[in-house]
Amino acid sequence: MNNTILPRNFYERPTLTVAGELLGKMLKFSNFSGIITEVEAYIGMDDPACHAARGYTNRTSVMFGTPGFSYVYFIYGMYYCLNIVTEAEGFPAAVLIRGLKLTEPLEANLGGPGILCKKLNITKEHNKQDLTISHEFCLYEYHLKPDYVCTPRIGISKGKEKFWRFKSCVLADMPKITLNNKY
C-alpha cells in the first residue's frame, strides 16, 4: 500500500468525479484499514437529498467548508454515517461512504454506512476532521481502479432518480458483516 495521504486537491474537484475515484482507495481509521467499495454523492442546495438543500445550518456547516473534511452525522436515532466534503469551499457537497472491504485487522465486507461506522467506532467526535493531515483518520491512494456501476441512491425519499450511487463490480465479493456479526 502507498502510504501517501490523498491531498486536499483530490477533494477540490466535482463530486461525481471524486465519488467514482474514491472506489478502490484505502480508508484508514485508528487500527482499521479497508478499500472503499461503495459511495453516494450529494451535491449542493439543488439536490433535495443533500443535507444542505435547506441551507446553511450548524449541522451542515462542514459541507460548506474546506474539502477533505469528514462530515459525520446521526440517523434514525441509532447510526452514524461518514461523508467526505468535496468541491470548492462555500459549495455544499459530500460523498457518503457506503461500503468498505476491511483489510485490517481482519478481512470482511462492511456493507451499509451505519454498519461501517458502527464496526469502526466512527461517531460524532469524528465530525469535522481534516482527512488530509492525520495518519490515524485519512484516505490513501491504493492504485486500484475497479470497474463500477452507477445506480440510483438508496435509503432516501427525495432525489432517488439521480444515478449517484457508485458501486464496485469486483470488490464486494466477500460475505457482508452485519450488526450481529462479532469480530
From Swiss-Prot:
The UniProt entry, under Gene3D superfamilies, shows: Methylpurine-DNA glycosylase (MPG) (3.10.300.10)
Which residues constitute the signal peptide according to the record? none
A Pfam family that this protein carries is Pur_DNA_glyco
Top-level EC class as recorded in UniProt = hydrolase
Alphabetized UniProt keyword annotations: DNA damage, DNA repair, Hydrolase
Q: Which GO terms describe its molecular function?
A: alkylbase DNA N-glycosylase activity; DNA binding
GO:BP terms for this protein?
Answer: base-excision repair
The record's listing under InterPro entries reads: Formyl_transferase-like_C_sf, MPG, MPG_sf
**Belongs to which family?**
Belongs to the DNA glycosylase MPG family.
**HAMAP family annotated for this entry?**
3MGH
Name listed for the protein in its UniProt record:
Putative 3-methyladenine DNA glycosylase
Q: In which organism is this protein found?
A: Wolbachia pipientis subsp. Culex pipiens (strain wPip)
